[in-house]
Amino acid sequence: MQQKQMNIELRSKTGKGISRKLRSADMVPGVVYGKGMDPMAVSINYRELQAAMAGEGGQNNLITLVGGGSLDQSMAIVADLQRDAVKGTYKHVDLHRVNMSEKLRVTVPVVLKGTAIGVKEGGLLDFAHHELHVECLPGNIPDHIEIDVTSLAVAHSIHVGEIALPEGVKVLDNPKTPVVSVLGRVKEEAEAAAEAAEA
C-alpha cells in the first residue's frame, strides 16, 4: 500500500457546464464522501490526480487530502474514476474518505509469479480471475496479491481459499472459485494420443 498526498479545492457550483470549464482548465471535478458526512464537491489538478494514483497501488493508494477546509489532512482512496470514452482522460472522480480504524472493502489485482510446471509440460495457463475482493483496514490495503504458480501441474487449479493473504486481509470471494488453472494434457500424453490416431 502506497501513501500519496493531493491538493483539493472545495467548489460551491456544480453541473455539466461547471465541469466542462474545470476540465478545460486542467482540473478534474470530483466529490468526497464518507461515513458521517455529506458529500462535498471538489476540484483537483489533473496532474496531481495522476500522481496520486501512480505506482502499483493505483486507485487503492491511500491519499492524504490537503486543503478543502474541513477535509484537510483527511485520508481517502479513489472509489470511482470516470474516463472519456474516446480520449481516456479523467472526467470525474469519487473519493471515499476513510477512517483508519475501520475496515473497508476494495478490489486488489492478482499477480502471478513463476512459470507453471504444467505449462512446461505443454498445458495452457488459464488466468480466470485477475482481481480479488478483500476487506481490511486502510493501512493494510495490499498493492497486489501474489500467487506462485511454479508447482501448478496440468489439470490442477489454485482456488481462492488456497491463496496466502497478507496479515489483516480477508478475501470476500468464494473460496472454491478457481483463480488460475493449467488446462490440457501433458505434452508426452498428447503426442502419444496423436501418434495413436495416425496409426
Swiss-Prot record:
Show the GO cellular component annotation of the record. cytosolic large ribosomal subunit
Question: Which SUPFAM superfamilies does the protein's record reference?
Answer: Ribosomal protein L25-like
Q: Name one GO molecular function term.
A: structural constituent of ribosome
User: Biological process GO annotation list?
Assistant: translation
Q: Name one Pfam family in it.
A: Ribosomal_TL5_C
Q: Which InterPro entries match?
A: Rbsml_bL25/Gln-tRNA_synth_N (IPR020056), Ribosomal_bL25/Gln-tRNA_synth (IPR011035), Ribosomal_bL25_b-dom (IPR020057), Ribosomal_bL25_C (IPR037121), Ribosomal_bL25_long (IPR001021), Ribosomal_L25_dom (IPR029751), Ribosomal_uL5_bac-type (IPR020930)
User: Which keywords does this Swiss-Prot/TrEMBL entry list?
Assistant: Ribonucleoprotein, Ribosomal protein, RNA-binding, rRNA-binding
Q: CDD domains from the entry?
A: Ribosomal_L25_TL5_CTC
What does the protein in this record do? This is one of the proteins that binds to the 5S RNA in the ribosome where it forms part of the central protuberance.
UniProt cross-references to HAMAP family, sorted A to Z: Ribosomal_bL25_CTC (MF_01334)
Entry similarity comment: Belongs to the bacterial ribosomal protein bL25 family. CTC subfamily.
Q: How does it assemble?
A: Part of the 50S ribosomal subunit; part of the 5S rRNA/L5/L18/L25 subcomplex. Contacts the 5S rRNA. Binds to the 5S rRNA independently of L5 and L18.
| Protein's name according to its UniProt entry | Large ribosomal subunit protein bL25
Biological source species:
Pelobacter propionicus (strain DSM 2379 / NBRC 103807 / OttBd1)
